[in-house]
Amino acid sequence: MNIVNTIKDVKLIIKKWKDENLSIGYVPTMGYLHEGHASLIKKAREENDKVIVSIFVNPIQFGPKEDYSIYPRDLVKDSSLCEKFEVDLIFNPETSEMYPNKIYSHVNVDILTQNLCGEKRPGHFQGVCTVLTKFFNILNPTKAYFGEKDAQQLAVVKKMVEDLNFPIEIIGCPIIREEDGLAKSSRNAYLNKQERKSALILNKSLKEALNALESGEKNSNNIRDIIVSKLNKEPLAKIDYVSIVDSITLQSVEKIQSSILVAIAVYIGKTRLIDNFTFKL
């Protein structure tokens, strides 16, 4: 397994693979890898000749009061996981490699970024789309793999790739959970013992909403009320948003008539966690 830090060096390797007509599966990450990332890597390994994992904590997708400076980093642990799952190449550039000069060009995807995390984290998806555009151009992958836990990100990236004619297939992979139901996340590392226990309220509230939907409830306000009521029973939980949106357009719906995304963002103490599920009538 190679660990490469420069765009020049990684492009030389990519060119060699392309000359040999090898397919490339790409898993973009910010590091501090866990079983959720591993599931993406395994899928990429199954479907491609070569697998690349990028590890880059992207500064332009963090807001001024967000956790960029303290975001967990552990390249040794990450490298071990990648080696275990037979990754061919880790691309781990420095910030100065990706952004050697002040950046004036940005990529925006309208409409899909108006709600959910796009509304609560201004500029976040502009940063995500911009860095992914750079990575797609540098690495030229055949397929790229994203977790469904970041459902809005997955929808935004799919639309960006469609609109800008990137010759890349975007693959969504299911949410991976702890045994007790908490969605795997690098930010779970921030939680103390009591907060970790309290964080289970996210999945519990979504399960109650799913039960109501499966029982025939079609009013999105009622579904939202079920989730809010459950979350409010947890003292350490502070709701950022609870949204029921169309799973394709990500626009709010009142009456549930087709495929929906039920998505929540909740602060447990100071840690912001997200979770979701999709439901089809």
From Swiss-Prot:
More about this protein: The reaction proceeds by a bi uni uni bi ping pong mechanism.
Keyword Ligase among UniProt keywords: yes
Residue numbers binding beta-alanine: 61
Highest taxon above the source species: Bacteria
Organism: Clostridium botulinum (strain 657 / Type Ba4)
Lineage summary: Bacteria, Bacillati, Bacillota, Clostridia, Eubacteriales
Binding site for ATP: 30-37, 147-150, 176, 184-187
Active site (UniProt): 37
A GO CC term assigned to this protein in UniProt: cytosol
Binding site for (R)-pantoate: 61, 153
Alphabetized GO MF terms: ATP binding; pantoate-beta-alanine ligase activity
Pathway of action: Cofactor biosynthesis; (R)-pantothenate biosynthesis; (R)-pantothenate from (R)-pantoate and beta-alanine: step 1/1
InterPro entries, per the entry: Cyt_trans-like, Pantoate_ligase, Pantoate_ligase_C, Rossmann-like_a/b/a_fold
Protein name: Pantothenate synthetase
Reactions performed catalytically: (R)-pantoate + beta-alanine + ATP = (R)-pantothenate + AMP + diphosphate + H(+)
Function text: Catalyzes the condensation of pantoate with beta-alanine in an ATP-dependent reaction via a pantoyl-adenylate intermediate.
Transmembrane segments: none
GO biological process, one term: pantothenate biosynthetic process
Subcellular compartments: Cytoplasm
Subunit text: Homodimer.
Stated family: Belongs to the pantothenate synthetase family.
Pfam families: Pantoate_ligase (PF02569)
The entry's keywords: ATP-binding, Cytoplasm, Ligase, Nucleotide-binding, Pantothenate biosynthesis
